[in-house]
Amino acid sequence: MKENDVVLRTVTKLVVFILLTFGFYVFFAGHNNPGGGFIGGLIFSSAFILMFLAFNVEEVLESLPIDFRILMIIGALVSSITAIIPMFFGKPFLSQYETTWILPILGQIHVSTITLFELGILFSVVGVIVTVMLSLSGGRS
C-alpha cells in the first residue's frame, strides 16, 4: 500500500465506524429479527479486514488489543458453556432462560441467555475469519 493513500485511509475510517455500528445493530436485532452472532461476526470481520487493507497490518494489530486466536477460543467456550449449563439444572442441552428486568432509566429490558450464546458465536466468527485472512495474506496470524 502506498504511503499517500489519503482518500482510502479517510474513507476507511468512516466505513469502519459504519460497519461496526451496523454490526452491533445486527447482533442485537438478531434475537427477534434476521441477524445475530454469525451475521454480526461477518460484519465485524469485514471492518477489521478493511482496516488491514487500508493501513499497515502490523500497525493495526499493534493498536488493537485483540489476539484473534484467543478471541476464537473464548467464543467457542462462551457458546459451549451457555449451551451446557442448563443440563446441570435438569433441562435439555441449549435450553434458554428469559426474563424481563425493569430498570429505573431504561425501563423494561428483555434479558435472555441466547444473547450470551450469540456473543460466543460472534467472537468465534470474528476470530476465525480474521485469523484465516491474516494467515492467507502472510501477516501475523
From Swiss-Prot:
TM annotation in the entry: 10-30, 35-55, 70-90, 114-134
Major localization class: membrane
GO-annotated cellular components: plasma membrane
GO molecular function, one term: antiporter activity
Keyword Transmembrane helix attributed: yes
Keyword Transport carried by entry: yes
InterPro entries associated with the record: CPA3_antiporter_subunitB (IPR050622), MnhB (IPR007182)
Assigned keywords, A-Z: Antiport, Cell membrane, Ion transport, Membrane, Transmembrane, Transmembrane helix, Transport
GO biological process terms, semicolon-separated: monoatomic ion transport
Compartments where found: Cell membrane
Membrane topology: Multi-pass membrane protein
Cross-referenced NCBIfam families: PRK12573.1 (NF009223), PRK12574.1 (NF009224)
Record's function text: Expression of the mnh2 operon in E.coli is not able to catalyze Na(+)Li(+)/H(+) antiport. It does however confer higher growth rates than the control strain at up to pH 9.5. The operon may encode an NADH-ubiquinone oxidoreductase.
Family, similarity comment: Belongs to the CPA3 antiporters (TC 2.A.63) subunit B family.
Subunit structure comment from the entry: May form a heterooligomeric complex that consists of seven subunits: mnhA2, mnhB2, mnhC2, mnhD2, mnhE2, mnhF2 and mnhG2.
UniProt name for this protein: Putative antiporter subunit mnhB2
Organism of derivation: Staphylococcus aureus
